[in-house]
Swiss-Prot record:
Substrate binds at residues 188, 217, 246, 282, 302-304, 343-346, 382, 409. Binds 1 [4Fe-4S] cluster per subunit. The cluster is coordinated with 3 cysteines and an exchangeable S-adenosyl-L-methionine. Belongs to the ThiC family. Homodimer. GO terms for molecular function: 4 iron, 4 sulfur cluster binding; carbon-carbon lyase activity; zinc ion binding. Catalyzes the synthesis of the hydroxymethylpyrimidine phosphate (HMP-P) moiety of thiamine from aminoimidazole ribotide (AIR) in a radical S-adenosyl-L-methionine (SAM)-dependent reaction. Its cofactor is [4Fe-4S] cluster. Gene3D superfamilies: 6.10.250.620, Radical SAM ThiC family, central domain (3.20.20.540). One of its GO terms (cellular component) is cytosol. This is Phosphomethylpyrimidine synthase.
């Protein structure tokens, strides 16, 4: 399936999904490589290596899993190889948090550490002045170089990071979420009652993996919820999250009043048995907080939050997710499912940002964190929402304080309400800012936000916007693995190595397409100009001439 030579190196992304055939992801000028573990020598961590025309190469964090390995054939319904199964079989049935607290480094922890480092070491001849000038400001975060398995173990033990890895999802490749690591991006997929099929959702999953989704949430609310989730899990090398409330509500035909703790509990167990890695649980929406939303412009915009608020009012009882929280912890501990404590009262408009209802729920999230940790369950906290730039820092500061530095997972935040059709841009601005402040996981927003169910193109555009935001934050934080790609691309740009510029880009296909709109011939890929400035006004070309003149003078 791989073609050699120049044409192979310059090919754009190919994705084919047939439920009875192979699914393949390829990247231009790239090959799949594996890094071996040291503590656990049988570990092989997949990465992507980009080959450059000047002989250099770049190793990248890779979310594509076996789909980009030409030596692995993936067919449905069997799904992916069960990578973690041998590790799980030979050890006690404990959570990653329990192992971490006991001082035990698991294979998953070493795997995640190797991924974070991306085979990257600082060169001995690094420009020290440049390093001092560009070193990041991590805002009290501690990012070691290199990141070790012991560091990951300690971060998990302290509750500052999670490694979501259900024992029944052995296909997943271990990854770490926390503010002392690379900023991660989540993609939402899933059908609705009006559209989408099992095949379409698997295709969206693999498409999301190709564009860098670190985690994926299946938010299906229509028919075949269980079948879609099972197929997604068996075909996903990244952690899968869900909102169990959606399926529980489907079981009672959408009748909120008919929903019970018992129905929800059975749904929770069923999804944990399937292998879901993290659950969004809206346990912080309490009776006494609901009246606080009355003055809001947009009320309660979280689906789960609004459903639980309605349930509380119909039954005149406290939220059963809160009253049964310890039982939920026991279920999740049995499978090593992580909490993603839902922000059911997040603001859905700039007018409602940072209000009393939002922060009241955040405080409860902090209390629930401590209960989850007591039960040995990993936990992260979901956050807003719609927040203007000047109020974002307060969100991060309060989350760190209330939730004792547990990972923060935010939807954006959107920094303005006026961008329907472009909310992926308005929210990526907020995402970059809050990720620099310490947010660990960014939930992408697509151009269809507020408008409809995303299609494949929307998924791509949302992920590209958020990978830019995450990378910008990693640069600002000074993550040791962040800057090399920027350096190599800038070098290629200055040296007019057009193919390398394209291949180092987040979206090589679009970069090449834009260039070729006006200069499509192969000769233009070696020209010392582009169509923006032409041969006479290219600043890079002139800069080379200036350098040559200076060298002659000196």
């Amino acid at each position: 399936m791989r073609r050699e030579g120049t044409m192979r190196l310059h090919r754009t992304f190919l994705l084919r999904v047939y439920l009875k055939e192979s699914a393949v992801i390829t990247y231009p000028a790239s090959k799949k490589i594996y890094c071996q573990g040291k503590i656990f020598p049988t570990i092989r961590v997949g990465m992507r290596e980009i080959q450059l025309t000047n002989g250099d190469s770049l190793t990248l964090y890779d979310t594509s899993g076996p789909y980009s390995d030409p030596n692995i054939s993936i067919k449905s319904p069997q799904g992916l190889p069960r990578l973690r199964e041998p590790w799980i079989k030979v050890r006690p049935r404990k959570t990653q948090l329990a192992f971490a607290k006991e001082g035990v480094i698991t294979p998953e922890m070493e795997y995640a550490a190797i991924r974070e480092n991306q085979k990257r070491e600082l060169k001995k001849n690094t420009d020290q002045e440049r390093e001092r000038r560009l070193q990041g400001n991590s805002l009290s975060a501690r990012i070691p170089n290199p990141i070790t398995p012991e560091f990951i173990r300690n971060e998990i033990a302290c509750g500052r990071a999670i490694l979501p890895a259900n024992i029944n999802h052995p296909e997943s490749e271990p990854m770490i979420i926390g503010r002392h690591f690379l900023v991660k991006v989540n993609a939402n997929i899933g059908n609705s009652s009006l559209t989408s099929s099992v095949e379409e959702e698997v295709e969206k999953l693999i498409w999301a993996l190709r564009w860098g989704a670190d985690t994926v949430m299946d938010l299906s609310t229509g028919k075949k919820i269980k079948e879609i989730r099972e197929t997604i899990l068996r075909h996903s090398p990244v952690p899968i999250g869900t909102v169990p409330l959606y399926e529980a509500l489907e079981k009672v035909d959408g009748d909120v009043k008919a929903l019970t703790w018992e129905i929800f509990r059975d749904t929770l167990i069923s999804q944990a048995e399937q292998g879901v890695d993290y659950f969004t649980i809206h346990a912080g929406v309490l009776n006494r907080f609901i009246p606080l939303t009355q003055k809001r412009v947009t009320g309660i915009v979280s689906r789960g939050g609004s459903l639980m608020a309605k349930w509380c009012l119909l039954h005149r009882e406290e939220n059963f997710l809160y009253t049964h929280f310890t039982e939920i912890c026991e279920i999740m501990r049995a499978y090593d499912v992580s909490f993603s404590l839902g922000d059911g009262l997040r603001p859905g408009s700039i007018a409602d940002a940072n209000d009393e209802a939002q922060f009241a729920e955040l405080k409860i999230q902090g209390e629930l964190n401590r209960i989850a940790w007591k039960y040995g369950v990993q936990v992260m906290n979901e956050g807003p929402g719609h927040i203007p730039l000047n109020l974002i820092e307060e969100n991060m500061t309060k989350q760190l304080a209330y939730c004792r530095e547990a990972p923060f997972y935010t939807l954006g935040p959107l920094t303005t309400d006026i961008a329907p059709g472009y909310d992926h841009i308005g929210s990526a601005i907020g995402a970059a800012f809050i990720a620099w402040q310490g947010c660990a996981l960014l939930c992408y927003v697509t151009p269809k936000e507020h408008l409809g169910l995303p299609n494949k193109q929307d998924v791509k555009e949302g992920l590209i916007a958020y990978k830019i935001a995450a990378h910008a934050a990693d640069l600002a934080k000074g993550h040791p693995a962040a800057r090399q790609r920027d350096y190599l691309l800038s070098q290629a740009r200055f040296e007019f190595r057009w193919h390398d510029q394209f291949n180092l880009a987040l979206d090589a296909e679009t970069a090449r397409l834009f260039h070729d709109e006006t200069l499509p011939k192969e000769a233009a890929k070696h020209a010392h100009f582009c169509s923006l400035c032409g041969p006479k006004f290219c600043a890079y070309k002139t800069s080379h001439e200036v350098r040559d003149t200076l060298q002659k003078v000196t």
